[in-house]
């Protein structure tokens, strides 16, 4: 049945799979096959939603990213509204396939009436340009970047601290390591547990940070999680991810404290033994 699917079902299903964290490589291969053979029939919204979904599932290859970016340029971005471009720029940024023409056009738009989510997405593309590609000279205008930063940070703050997060924080307390929960960097990136003086960011990753199949969870972080780690590293932070499937099986405080000590030893040994 998959082979008979035609747009718009393809990008709708791809979007739904990404929202559920299901990385169905076979399905995405079929969808990109349709893109390759009939891209001129795909609307801008379909291409952008597909790029976002594939990037979220870590299935946006350099070839696929180039195909979609080239088509957007070929159309001179006709039909690409603010939401479409925010999805596309985020997808390219998150997958490490930035396109200067796409970014440049998106950054030149008037974003004042854009939805908060769109501003947050294009701001993350702005961070890639700022932190990883400063030589390209592409950036959002300062007022837009400021607004995007605020919406990006607000979205992170809406995610409440989990029991897992609090438990990891308690382990730091047992080790007598000073730390800050829900720390915000200058660029507006929220860190679960931070030691600013050591530039160490601890990211506590629950199940929603990982991809899954139709039958079970995997241990592969999703595109958003990998992207955030990369932005933190580009900003000069060392990142220590602590996954729920590593932490929760440790049955007592002693085991969890020992685990945390082992994780910290290669990254920040100066924090230990205080």
Regions found by a protein language model. Give the residues of each.
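Eukaryotic RNA-binding helical-repeat scaffolds
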Residues: 1-274
